[in-house]
Swiss-Prot record:
GO CC aspect terms: cytoplasm; plasma membrane
Chief location: cytoplasm
Family to which this protein belongs: Belongs to the HflD family.
Gene that specifies this protein: hflD
The protein's name: High frequency lysogenization protein HflD homolog
Membrane-related topology note: Peripheral membrane protein
Biological source species: Pseudoalteromonas translucida (strain TAC 125)
Domain of life per record: Bacteria
Length: 200
């Protein structure tokens, strides 16, 4: 277990936390939204940290990760389900070359639109959400989102959630690229906790 694997885990936890906020309260941290959505277009970063413009931007994610792993801490079942769902969906994606190629093309299209719009612009968020719906959702492994029905019916809420889940897939890809394995949760918990504590 290394720092980059824990960083990717923290990013997935931060995505899960933002999905919760949007689904349950209809709001989100705009800075976190920008950082997480920007990670999607970081397809050739100079370093893993560059995906998130530095690990300082993931402090909430590290805190959330610690809360899930620390002894005696109250676990958030939704966070666990979201992160597990992202990992499962990423595995399905990595096994499908056609979907991977389509994902790359669609992300390139979004990158070009950023010459005119911010990553958090509603039209860009809608574009990212559409990528999730048309490229990732057909792979199965649907991620169930929990929230207020009146919020989940709103198009903007749906778009933000799907765009955030796409960002979560980006972090799940990084987790795998850095050598992350599911067994690390059982055999490297102390190491994960130590690294996360050093980041907050």
């Amino acid at each position: 277990m290394n720092q980059h694997q824990v960083m990717a885990l923290a990013a997935m936890c931060q995505v899960a936390k933002q999905v919760q906020k949007v689904a349950q309260y209809g709001n989100n941290n705009e800075h976190d939204l920008e950082i997480l959505l920007s990670s999607i277009i970081q397809t050739s970063p100079a370093s893993p940290e560059d995906v998130y413009q530095g690990t300082d931007n993931l402090r909430d994610g590290y805190k959330t990760l610690l809360a899930q792993l620390s002894a005696g801490a109250q676990k958030d079942v939704e966070i666990v389900k979201y992160v597990g769902g992202l990992m499962q969906l990423e595995r399905a994606l990595s096994a499908n070359d056609k979907s991977l190629n389509e994902l790359g093309k669609r992300i390139d299209d979004i990158h070009r639109r950023l010459d005119h719009f911010a990553i958090t612009d509603e039209s860009v968020v809608a574009g990212l959400a559409d990528i999730y719906s048309t490229v990732l959702s057909p792979l199965g492994h649907r991620i169930q989102v929990y929230g207020k029905p009146e919020l989940l019916k709103q198009q903007l809420t749906q778009n933000k959630i799907r765009a955030l889940l796409l960002a979560g897939i980006r972090s799940a890809v990084l987790w795998r690229q850095m050598g992350g394995k599911r067994r690390h949760f059982f055999f490297a918990k102390r190491k994960i906790i130590a690294i996360a504590k050093a980041k907050i």
